Regions:
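Short peripheral tails and domain-boundary helices/loops at the edges of structured domains
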Residues: 11, 79-111
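Hydrophobic membrane-insertion alpha-helices, especially the h-region
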Residues: 10-27
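Short, Lys/Arg- and Gly-enriched loop/turn segments at beta-strand edges
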Residues: 67-79, 95-99, 153-156
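Short extracytoplasmic
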Residues: 44-75
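N-terminal positive-inside, membrane-proximal cytosolic segments immediately preceding the first
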Residues: 1-11
Length: 167
């Protein structure tokens, strides 16, 4: 009886591990698919304390669109905390995303976001880079994303300068 119970426990443990690995691999595959096939969009970086931008081997990011969303939802962050929402966006001629009025004919695209704490979370707030290459990213003015048209998920694939040239 004890041996059967022990064997059943092992089977349950192995199945749980397989399930977790399958879920993680599915999430990774979804992000990779978005990065490979998504629409190129750029989000303007918002000003941030320069001493806080470069932290070792990563750069803290803040996006102007997130600031706009926070202002438009002022006073409701507590009620919205953790909830997923979609921001209607339009792209200018350069591919830079701007918040659109919800009923605008130009807002065929949506960007998925969530409130974390008191801030809008657009999927990332940091960009990691190779040790010793911080100087290269000091001229960053935009985050370069791939946007899934169907889900609204955006994957950061790099940073760009004022001319949208990759860094």
């Amino acid at each position: 009886m004890k041996a059967t119970r022990k064997r059943l426990d092992r089977i349950v443990l192995v199945l749980a591990c397989v399930l977790v690995l399958a879920l993680v691999n599915g999430l990774v595959a979804r992000k990779e698919h978005t990065a490979a096939t998504g629409l190129d969009i750029y989000l303007a970086l918002a000003p941030i304390d320069p001493r806080a931008i470069l932290q070792g081997d990563y750069m803290t990011l803040r996006f102007a669109l997130a600031d706009e969303l926070e202002r438009s939802k002022a006073g409701t962050q507590g009620a919205l905390r953790g909830q997923i929402a979609y921001a209607p966006i339009s792209l200018d001629e350069r591919g830079v995303a701007h918040l659109s009025p919800a009923n605008s004919a130009h807002s065929a695209l949506s960007l998925r976001y969530r409130f974390r704490g008191q801030q809008v979370w657009l999927g990332t707030n940091a960009f990691f880079f190779e040790e010793g290459s911080a100087k290269r990213y000091e001229s960053a003015r935009f985050g370069h994303f791939k946007l899934s048209r169907s889900s609204g998920d955006a994957v950061l694939i790099g940073l760009a300068d004022e001319s949208l040239q990759p860094l």
